[in-house]
């Protein structure tokens, strides 16, 4: 199977939550010859719709114990080839951990599984049904030569791959160890967050607990990105990196101290009343040190978001306080391909808009309705708010999102959480949302982003300790506080400490 590099921010989010947990691997697995048991998975084991392409022991290295690595391909329907990798450690803790990916997937890495293996988890991963060298360009696998949608692969990517990876993974674990996993958990961010919600909604029996970070759970992430791109591509509206730095400093000057602590992080960007016109150029100012009228207009537009004629959201607002992290997500400041700035919509114009040659410059708020009613939206979006089957079986869901995420909107995740609480009886005992101030997409940003999500999920599922506050720290920084179960947020106090309010 081909391997590709996973988005660094996604890996950082996964590794940060795994690394600090104090729980160690539990009892050793039943006595057996690991090498023989591993080889037998390729030579003798038979799994439905699956070809095991390799199974071999990998020696221990540093913090990783020796493990059996199993690679295979699942072919549930014609045209489908779902690559899977399972890593089965010697010091198995009798649990399984499935890991999501980022972007349009197409990648499986050891790096993503390292911390889980170190703690004794059998890890489960998939390429989501295709190989893809760039996280934002889906054209190589999602589009047929005639320009039509490659529906088998798009459905694999949307939900089928992660489910089949899980069911097969449980069988592989049981075959290798001679015992079923006592618990199965899932962790992912971005696309991985969407996959986590998809599991909760479509396949509620797969996992005992799910961590879904910054979920790109509807195509509004892509439509929002496209509308923002067009706002900054208007004549005279382009922003350069120095403009973003200028705006960031002005926002903090206007709003930072109002949340109880002038620490470089806005606790709740929604409360910030910064007005872009305060940076408008006056006579004699250098263009890099101020904003021209078109730039002010574009900035106001992305701060406010856009709506359809019906009043429904077309583009979520970009929240204030995270401007220093906008570079990758604003067309004028990024040198990448168009997909980098529109969330990959450029390559999927055919499946989304019914026209493979659609001019994206003509994308408007009303085009959003066509995207949201497309066939792809029907299989891709994880927007079901009634998650009763998952809740009834005792499943636990931790949602989290950085408040400075310039990709999928934090507000969209809050919107989903609040709707699910209303739609699902007793979900308040099965679901938590944590909003992390100053944290960008799946990690990074100015706020503390090292949070032990997996330990929190284990404590909830295995010890009935529902998470309410979780310590958050930042590498090479003294800035730290507890992230709080929403709607509470960490708030600065007069003594320099923070509390959840």
What are the residue ranges of the model-derived segments?
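Glycine-rich nucleophile elbow surrounding the catalytic serine of serine-hydrolase chemistry
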Residues: 107, 188-198
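Short beta-strand/loop motif that positions the catalytic acidic residue
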Residues: 398-401
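Conserved alpha/beta-hydrolase "acid-adjacent" motif
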Residues: 407-411
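Cap/lid segment of the alpha/beta-hydrolase catalytic domain
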Residues: 103-181, 224-225, 232-235, 357-379, ...
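Catalytic-loop region of hydrolases
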Residues: 24-95, 99, 110-113, 261-266, ...
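Histidine-bearing beta->alpha loop at or near hydrolase active sites
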Residues: 431-444, 476-477
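Alpha/beta-hydrolase fold nucleophile elbow
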Residues: 179-190
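A catalytic-pocket lid/entrance helix-loop region that shapes and gates access to the active site
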Residues: 198-200, 205-307, 435
């Amino acid at each position: 199977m081909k391997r590709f590099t996973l988005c660094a921010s996604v890996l950082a989010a996964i590794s940060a939550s795994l690394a600090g947990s104090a729980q160690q691997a539990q009892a050793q697995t039943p006595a057996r010859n690991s090498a023989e048991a591993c080889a037998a998975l390729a030579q003798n084991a038979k799994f439905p719709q699956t070809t095991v392409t390799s199974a071999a022991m990998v020696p221990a290295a540093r913090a990783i114990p020796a493990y059996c690595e199993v690679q295979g391909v699942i072919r549930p329907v014609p045209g489908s080839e779902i690559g899977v990798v399972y890593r089965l450690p010697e010091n198995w803790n009798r649990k399984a951990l499935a890991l999501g990916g980022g972007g349009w997937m197409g990648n499986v890495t050891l790096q993503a599984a390292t911390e889980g293996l170190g703690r004794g988890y059998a890890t489960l991963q998939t390429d989501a049904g295709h190989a893809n060298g760039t996280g934002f360009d889906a054209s190589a696998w999602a589009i047929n030569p005639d320009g039509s949608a490659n529906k088998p692969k798009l459905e694999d990517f949307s939900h089928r791959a992660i489910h089949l990876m899980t069911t097969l993974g449980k069988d592989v674990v049981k075959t290798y160890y001679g015992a079923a996993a006592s618990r199965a958990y899932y962790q992912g961010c971005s696309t991985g967050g969407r996959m986590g919600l998809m599991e909760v909604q479509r396949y509620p029996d797969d996992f005992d607990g799910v961590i879904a970070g910054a979920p790109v759970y509807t195509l509004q992430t892509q439509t929002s990105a496209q509308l923002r791109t067009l706002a900054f591509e208007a004549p005279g509206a382009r922003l350069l990196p120095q403009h973003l730095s200028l705006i960031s400093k002005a926002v903090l000057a206007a709003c930072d101290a109002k949340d109880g602590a002038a620490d470089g992080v806005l606790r709740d960007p929604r409360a910030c009343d910064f007005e872009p016109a305060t940076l408008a150029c006056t006579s004699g100012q250098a263009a890099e040190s101020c904003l021209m009228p078109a730039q002010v207009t574009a900035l106001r537009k992305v701060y406010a978001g856009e709506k359809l004629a019906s009043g429904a959201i077309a583009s979520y607002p970009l929240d204030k306080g995270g401007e220093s992290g906008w570079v990758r997500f604003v067309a004028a400041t990024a040198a990448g391909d168009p997909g980098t700035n529109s969330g990959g919509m450029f390559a999927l114009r055919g499946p989304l808009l019914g026209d493979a040659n659609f001019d994206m410059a003509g994308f408007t708020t009303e085009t959003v309705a066509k995207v949201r009613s497309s066939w792809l939206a029907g299989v891709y979006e994880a927007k079901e708010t009634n998650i009763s089957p998952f809740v009834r079986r005792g499943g636990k869901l931790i949602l989290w999102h950085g408040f400075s995420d310039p990709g999928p909107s934090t507000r969209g995740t809050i919107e989903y959480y609040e709707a699910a609480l209303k739609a699902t009886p007793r979900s308040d005992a099965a679901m938590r949302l944590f909003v992390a101030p100053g944290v960008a997409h799946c990690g990074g940003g100015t706020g503390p982003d090292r949070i032990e999500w997996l330990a929190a999920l284990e404590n909830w599922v295995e010890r009935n300790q529902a998470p309410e506050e979780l310590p958050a720290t930042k590498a090479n920084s003294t800035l730290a506080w507890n992230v709080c179960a929403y709607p509470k947020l960490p708030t600065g106090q007069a003594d320099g400490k923070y509390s959840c309010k």
